[in-house]
Structures are given as structure tokens and as C-alpha cells.
């Protein structure tokens, strides 16, 4: 989740994601990823965004992505290993917002490899962070 800035669409996605799981773990895209996405440095750094995301009531854990490309494949593997070490029988679900679909994301390969279910299209695409930061 870039959350740069957080808007109601992000909150809706988190709320709907939390309805699917006992504990919601959120990946916060890092500063390098934010710059790759927009072509300019993020106006809210990764720690700032992580602090905001952690404060949302639906979120149980948040960590900054370790990936250096635009995906979160390596971070999914890290989460998978952490979660399975805590509860080997837990089902892990990777969720995406209203404008992201499983067959279009690079994370599908790692999710398929680890048997992680993907639930996409969570929430309506009612807001766009890019539009919010334009003057």
C-alpha cells in the first residue's frame, strides 16, 4: 500500500481486508518504490506512511516493503515465513484494492508458489492519491 496520501479508498480496502482475516498485516511500499511509481520522491516518507497505516483500527501489523522494484514479492515471502512460524496452519490472503486484479499483478507468481489466496477488487475506486497531490 502506497498510501501517499491515505484516502477513503485505502480505508475501505483495509476494512474489507480485515473482514477476511483474524489479523491484518499490511505492506507499506518503501520510498524507492514510491519514487519509481510517480517519478518523484514521496512527499510522505515510508516511516511517516507506516505510522499512519499502523494507527488505522483495522491494521494489526504494518511493515515497510523490502523489495527494490515495484512489486512486493520479496516482502510477501517474508510475511509468509513470519506468519507460518507463528501458526503453520494459518491461511494467508493477499488483498488488492478496487482497481487491482490478480491476473495483472507481479505478486501472483509468489502467491501461487506459496499457496496464498489473492482477493482483488476490494473497495470502489473512488479516490486517487495522484489527483490529491496535484495543484
Predicted regions and their residues:
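Nucleotidyltransferase catalytic core that binds NTPs
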Residues: 1-135
Amino acid at each position: 500500500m502506497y498510501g501517499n496520501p491515505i484516502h477513503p479508498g485505502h480505508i475501505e480496502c483495509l476494512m474489507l481486508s480485515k473482514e477476511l482475516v483474524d489479523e491484518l498485516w499490511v505492506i507499506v511500499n518503501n520510498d524507492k518504490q514510491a519514487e519509481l511509481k510517480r517519478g518523484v520522491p514521496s512527499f510522505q516518507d515510508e516511516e511517516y506512511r507506516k505510522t499512519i497505516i499502523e494507527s488505522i483500527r483495522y491494521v494489526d501489523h504494518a511493515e515497510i516493503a523490502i523489495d527494490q522494484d515495484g512489486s512486493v514479492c520479496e516482502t510477501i515471502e517474508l510475511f509468509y515465513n513470519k506468519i507460518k512460524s507463528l501458526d503453520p496452519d494459518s491461511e494467508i490472503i493477499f488483498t488488492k484494492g478496487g482497481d487491482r486484479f490478480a491476473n495483472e499483478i507481479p505478486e501472483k507468481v509468489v502467491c501461487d508458489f506459496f499457496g496464498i489466496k489473492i482477493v482483488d477488487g476490494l473497495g470502489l475506486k473512488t479516490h486517487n492519491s495522484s489527483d490529491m497531490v496535484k495543484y
